[in-house]
Regions:
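Extreme N-terminal starter segment of soluble prokaryotic enzymes
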Residues: 2-4
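Conserved, mostly hydrophobic/aromatic
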Residues: 10
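Hydrophobic beta/alpha structural segments that scaffold and line small-molecule/cofactor pockets
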Residues: 13
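Short, surface-exposed, low-complexity cationic segments
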Residues: 20-34
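A charge-rich, low-complexity, intrinsically flexible signal that marks solvent-exposed coils, linkers
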Residues: 38-52, 56, 61-63, 95-97, ...
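Extended, loop-rich substrate-binding clefts of extracytoplasmic carbohydrate-active enzymes
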Residues: 60-121
Length: 122
């Protein structure tokens, strides 16, 4: 597993890239990251659907873990997304972080964008 720590405008962001290629958003807060605050039995068991950056639904694809009460908790192909790249740039208004993920069977790419404005902790 690889961990990416980012601090911007007093916000702490932690991404974990797991051995299976999935990227997880573990922390996004003004508080420091403490792994013990978030670990639970569900995450320890299979990680499926936990802390995903994005969920993607394509009609006709089956969902694993079907239901959790009255709601779906995992989307397809969202649960299969693998980490491809993280770009970290700065422009005249602040910092821009883009996380690219892909799903090999369908060929789709998902880009999640995190925009930070200079001097503003939001």
């Amino acid at each position: 597993m690889k961990r990416i720590n980012i601090n911007e405008n007093k916000i702490n962001i932690v991404f974990d890239i797991e051995d299976n290629g999935q990227i997880k958003l573990m922390h996004f807060s003004a508080l420091p990251f403490n792994e013990n605050d978030i670990w639970d039995e569900m995450y320890e068991k299979d990680h499926l659907g936990c802390f995903d950056i994005a969920q993607v639904e394509i009609a006709g694809l089956d969902r694993p873990c079907e239901r959790h009460g009255t709601k779906y908790i995992v989307t397809a192909p969202g649960y299969r997304l693998k980490y491809k790249d993280l770009s970290d740039t700065r422009d005249n208004i602040g910092r821009l972080i883009k996380v690219t993920q892909y799903d090999e069977p369908t060929g789709i790419e998902v880009i999640s964008t995190f925009r930070f404005y200079d001097g503003i902790s939001i």
